[in-house]
């Protein structure tokens, strides 16, 4: 029985770039279900590739896009921040700072489930990422407190 084929890093990078383009083309207040599903599929596919084993296609471009995503988020342009973070990830698919930025943008867009998934992926890549850990703990505490209030 043959192994199912897994996407290559080049194919994953292409998918991230296409997601960034799709986010730029729409102006809804929330993300399309297709985008959320595709981000989940990309995260799952990336977990079959060991971070650092393959060189990032263009780390300098990724860093520039990270700076652009940070500025967009500071200006309240969450969709732009997410698009830039995903485009940056096309150049550096295992960059924890870009995954963290994508998660932060998702949270600001109200996509809490996506934000949690991306924060967890950030920590999968870099378990010592302090900001991702702090945000994940804060969100977890919030939801645990919310469940406790519902049970009472």
Question: What feature does the model see in each segment?
Answer:
Residues 1-58, 152:
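Long, contiguous interaction/recruitment modules in multidomain scaffold/adaptor proteins
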Residues 54-108, 121:
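Alpha-helical adaptor scaffolds
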Residues 46, 71, 105, 139-146:
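TPR/TPR-like alpha-solenoid repeats
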Residues 112-117, 141-152:
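Alpha-helical linker/edge segments of TPR/alpha-solenoid repeat scaffolds
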């Amino acid at each position: 029985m043959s192994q199912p084929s897994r996407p290559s890093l080049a194919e994953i990078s292409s998918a991230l770039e296409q997601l960034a383009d799709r986010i730029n083309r729409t102006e809804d207040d929330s993300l399309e279900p297709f985008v959320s599903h595709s981000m989940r599929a990309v995260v799952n596919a990336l977990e079959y590739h060991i971070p650092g084993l393959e060189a990032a296609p263009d780390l300098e471009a990724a860093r520039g896009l990270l700076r652009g995503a940070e500025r967009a988020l500071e200006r309240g342009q969450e969709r732009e921040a997410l698009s830039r973070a995903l485009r940056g990830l096309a150049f550096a698919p295992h960059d924890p700072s870009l995954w963290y930025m994508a998660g932060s943008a998702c949270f600001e867009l109200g996509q809490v489930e996506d934000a949690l998934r991306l924060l967890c992926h950030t920590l999968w890549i870099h378990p010592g990422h302090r900001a991702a850990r702090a945000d994940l703990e804060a969100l977890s505490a919030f939801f645990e407190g919310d469940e406790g209030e519902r049970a009472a």
